[in-house]
Amino acid sequence: MAELYVKPGNKERGWNDPPQFSYGLQTQAGGPRRSLLTKRVAAPQDGSPRVPASETSPGPPPMGPPPPSSKAPRSPPVGSGPASGVEPTSFPVESEAVMEDVLRPLEQALEDCRGHTRKQVCDDISRRLALLQEQWAGGKLSIPVKKRMALLVQELSSHRWDAADDIHRSLMVDHVTEVSQWMVGVKRLIAEKRSLFSEEAANEEKSAATAEKNHTIPGFQQAS
């Protein structure tokens, strides 16, 4: 290819004359050649050295924790119910026994004993129950005493005499200053009601035995 770009030397010149390049052959073979020089950016007028764009372009700021919110947390509006599917937390509330629920069974037990117990004993029990009602209505009894009395009445109504007597003793030990004036009557009422129940049970058993003894055998006729 070198011979296409070089013309033979001038015969009239010396042997060491340099060859002459043909510009026309160069343009025909390769076309216009691009200049390898790049454009230079003019220097800034203020005279400060120019920094490449890659060094001056700021990157994204570092991510830090979000700033605290200046707004206080808003409470839910009044009257708004809980979210669906979530039940409100229920706190156990200590229920207080009702005075009528305790006194009514005791008075009924006293009425059952009348006619089977001496009048003096029944009158003393009635007076003690009146003191119990007075102190209860006056707010002089604590919640533990009221709750134990409710349990005592349940055991008494169910004819569980030993359990009722155990509750009576626990009240005398733990709350003697509250119950000493009327608990004696409750204790006597438990004993009288227990005795009456045992007597009634014995009478029923005796009556059943007598009825069985006097029962006529089917098909058997006594001689007239």
Swiss-Prot record:
What are the alphabetically sorted keywords of the record? Activator, Apoptosis, Cytoplasm, Nucleus, Phosphoprotein, Receptor, Ribonucleoprotein, Transcription, Transcription regulation
Entry keyword annotation includes Protein biosynthesis: no
Task: Give the UniProt tissue specificity note.
Answer: Highly expressed in liver and skeletal muscle and to a lesser extent in brain. Also expressed in both normal and tumorigenic breast epithelial cell lines. Significantly up-regulated in human tumors of the breast, ovary, and uterus.
| Localization terms from the record | Nucleus; Cytoplasm
Family matches, as InterPro entries: SRA1/Sec31 (IPR009917), Steroid_recept_RNA_1 (IPR040243)
Does the keyword ATP-binding feature in the UniProt annotation? no
Give the region (Disordered) as residue ranges. 1-90, 201-224
A single GO BP annotation from the record? negative regulation of myoblast differentiation
| Compositional bias segments (type: Pro residues) | 58-76
**Example GO molecular function:** transcription coactivator activity
Q: Where is the composition biased (Basic and acidic residues)?
A: 201-215
According to the UniProt record, one GO cellular component term is: cytosol
Positions carrying Phosphoserine: 48, 57, 75
Q: How does it assemble?
A: SRA1 RNA exists in a ribonucleoprotein complex containing NCOA1. The RNA also forms a complex with PUS1 and RARG in the nucleus. Interacts with AR.
Q: What does this protein do?
A: Functional RNA which acts as a transcriptional coactivator that selectively enhances steroid receptor-mediated transactivation ligand-independently through a mechanism involving the modulating N-terminal domain (AF-1) of steroid receptors. Also mediates transcriptional coactivation of steroid receptors ligand-dependently through the steroid-binding domain (AF-2). Enhances cellular proliferation and differentiation and promotes apoptosis in vivo. May play a role in tumorigenesis.
Miscellaneous comment text of the record: Appears to be the first example of a new class of functional RNAs also able to encode a protein.
The UniProt similarity line reads: Belongs to the SRA1 family.
The name on file for this protein is: Steroid receptor RNA activator 1
What taxonomic classification does the UniProt entry list for its organism? Eukaryota, Metazoa, Chordata, Craniata, Vertebrata
- Gene that this polypeptide is encoded by: SRA1
